[in-house]
Amino acid sequence: VNGGYVMPAWYDILGPDLVSQQDAAGIQASERAIVALIAQEVARGIPAERIVLAGFSQGCAMALHTALRLPQKLAGIMALSGYLPLADRLTAERHPANGSTPVFMAHGTQDPVVVIARGEASRDALAALGQPVEWHSYPMPHSLHPREISDISAFLARVLGPAA
């Protein structure tokens, strides 16, 4: 996908459509690293209920994948310009701890990297499982939009509330 060049990534992209072939082993290895990071923060005194797992692009994919399988309740999930990987496994692997955790999803209408249809399909898959999803689209490519930043701020204020 990257012309054969090595670059940092959460997992390998095996095809241009992102989902017909997926690097399950790489996704699961990154999931373990994220779970370990969350455990480290909890051990430092941050309650899991005060953590929002967020990511952009592949980070979005990892935030969705990991949070929905996590046995600790999180404050929220923020999924920006990405998609739900290994969606066909979610029903079997989903943990109920985050079944009602709010998900903020945002995507650019002109995204050439992760086309908006991929994000919409992910949104629809989550909604079909009863996951509360707040969807936003913005006139942008694979990037951030000023209005998106404002919407993110409002979401974080809602799910985190006042500082403890």
Go through each PLM region and give its residues.
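A short beta-to-alpha transition loop/helix N-cap that caps and shapes the active-site region
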Residues: 1-2, 84-89, 113
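Short, proline-enriched alpha-helix->beta-strand connector loops that line the catalytic pocket
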Residues: 49, 98-103, 129-132
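Primarily recognizes the serine-hydrolase "nucleophile elbow" in alpha/beta-hydrolase
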Residues: 47-98
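C-terminal catalytic histidine-bearing segment of alpha/beta-hydrolase fold enzymes
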Residues: 117-164
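Serine-hydrolase catalytic machinery in alpha/beta-hydrolase-like enzymes
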Residues: 1-52
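Short beta-strand/loop motif that positions the catalytic acidic residue
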Residues: 104-107, 111
